Regions:
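A short, N-terminal "cap"/entry segment at the start of jelly-roll beta-barrel domains
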Residues: 1-34, 125-149
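Short acidic-glycine-tyrosine-enriched beta hairpin
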Residues: 8-9, 65, 72-90
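Conserved short histidine dyad/triad with adjacent acidic residue
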Residues: 9, 22-25, 38-53
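Short beta-strand segments in beta-sandwich/barrel cores
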Residues: 22, 46-48, 64-69, 83
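Ligand-binding loop in jelly-roll beta-barrel domains
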Residues: 31, 67, 87-112
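Short, conserved beta-strand element in jelly-roll/cupin
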Residues: 37-43, 52-70, 105
Length: 149
C-alpha cells in the first residue's frame, strides 16, 4: 500500500551513535523497493574507521562541512554537496568545524534496524576503542564490517 508520509521539522526517532544523532525520518516500502531517510546531526570528532554496509547510501550535506572517505578517495563536501556510497564500499566521514547536518538516504530497510541496535548497545559517552566488543557484535548482526577487519 502506498501512503504519503509527512514529518515535521524536529520529528523522528533519534538514534544517538558515536558519530552523531541519526534521526529516522521515513521508511518507504512499496512494489518498487524500499529506502530509508535519516537526518544526521554530527559533532566534530575523530574520523571513525571506514566500514562496509550491505546498503547503498546517499549523503547530502545540509549544513557545515565534512570530509567523506569513500573507497580510499577523500571528498571535501560543502552544503549542497552530495556523495553516493555504493553498497559494499568502505566509507566514513569526519566533520570539519564544529558540527554538520546531513540528509542520508539508504537503500533497503536495514540501516534503521542497524542504527537502533547500535544506539541501544554502544555507549556514546566513551571512546569507540573502549566499546569495540559491542561495536563488533552489532555490526556482525547486521552485515556491516569494519574495512580491513
Amino acid at each position: 500500500m502506498n501512503t504519503t508520509t509527512y514529518v515535521r521539522p524536529g520529528e523522528g526517532r533519534h538514534y544517538p551513535m558515536i558519530d552523531g544523532d541519526h534521526i529516522a525520518k521515513a521508511a518507504v516500502h512499496d512494489t518498487g523497493g524500499a529506502f530509508e531517510v535519516f537526518e544526521v546531526i554530527a559533532p566534530a570528532k575523530p574520523m571513525a574507521p571506514p566500514h562496509v554496509s550491505p546498503w547503498a547510501g546517499v549523503l547530502f550535506l545540509l549544513e557545515g562541512q565534512i570530509t567523506a572517505l569513500v573507497d580510499g578517495t577523500s571528498y571535501d563536501v560543502e552544503p549542497g554537496g552530495l556523495v553516493v556510497v555504493p553498497a559494499g564500499t568502505p566509507a566514513t566521514f569526519a566533520v570539519v568545524g564544529e558540527s554538520a547536518r546531513l540528509l542520508a538516504i539508504t537503500s533497503g530497510d536495514g540501516a534503521g534496524r542497524f542504527f537502533a541496535d547500535f544506539a541501544g548497545s554502544v555507549p556514546v559517552d566513551q571512546p569507540a576503542e573502549d566499546s569495540m566488543a559491542a561495536i563488533l557484535a552489532v555490526t556482525g548482526r547486521h552485515g556491516v564490517a569494519l574495512a580491513g577487519g
